[in-house]
Amino acid sequence: MSVDNVLDKLVDEKKYRRRDLRNSLASRIGIEDRPSSTPREPPKKRLRFTNVPLDVSDFTLEDMVKEFAEPIYCNFYDLKDSRTAVFEFEDPSVMERVVEKYNETPLNGGTVTVEIFEQERRPDRRRRTQRDNRRGNGRGSRGSHYKRQDRPAMEDELNAELEDYMKSS
């Protein structure tokens, strides 16, 4: 065999696929079956205002924050007795300046707490492992009738039930 023939033969052969990946549905529909080895994004750093009195408007908080920079994300959460506001900025140094200025600041009769927190990304729903699917993910995969054990009726109970039936007819 010449070198050209060997090279031609090598090029014509298909790449070997692992047996455990051969029959998965993912390869047939064009998605990746295994989690990729790409590094995860670092967690997002956001700014959280807590214990904000209910009578403080969204616009007031936005104006306080816009003194430093325009937020790229903002959201407000109303709780029973206070509010929480979350902001995100392009530049993390802006958040530190906002914390320095507004942390433990009195606002409309309440003391506002400002802190920087890291928000972890939620795992992608499509990337559940098969082991999670076998367990049922706590979603009640089995019906409730599996949980109760029906005890056999005792002889005395059956006799009493039969007597009641016979008396009623």
From Swiss-Prot:
Occurrences of domain RRM (ranges): 45-119
Pfam family, one: FoP_duplication
InterPro entries: FoP_C, Nucleotide-bd_a/b_plait_sf, RBD_domain_sf, RRM_dom, Yra2_RRM
Bridged cysteine pairs (disulfide): none
Region described as Disordered: 119-169
Gene3D superfamilies, alphabetized: 3.30.70.330
GO terms for biological process, alphabetical: mRNA transport
GO CC list: nucleus
Keyword rRNA processing: no
Family of this protein: Belongs to the YRA1 family.
Subunit and interaction comment: Associates with mRNPs.
Biological role: Involved in export of poly(A) mRNAs from the nucleus. Recruited to the coding sequences as well as poly-A sites of active genes.
Protein name in the entry: RNA annealing protein YRA2
Taxonomic source organism: Zygosaccharomyces rouxii (strain ATCC 2623 / CBS 732 / NBRC 1130 / NCYC 568 / NRRL Y-229)
Organism placement in taxonomy: Eukaryota, Fungi, Dikarya, Ascomycota, Saccharomycotina
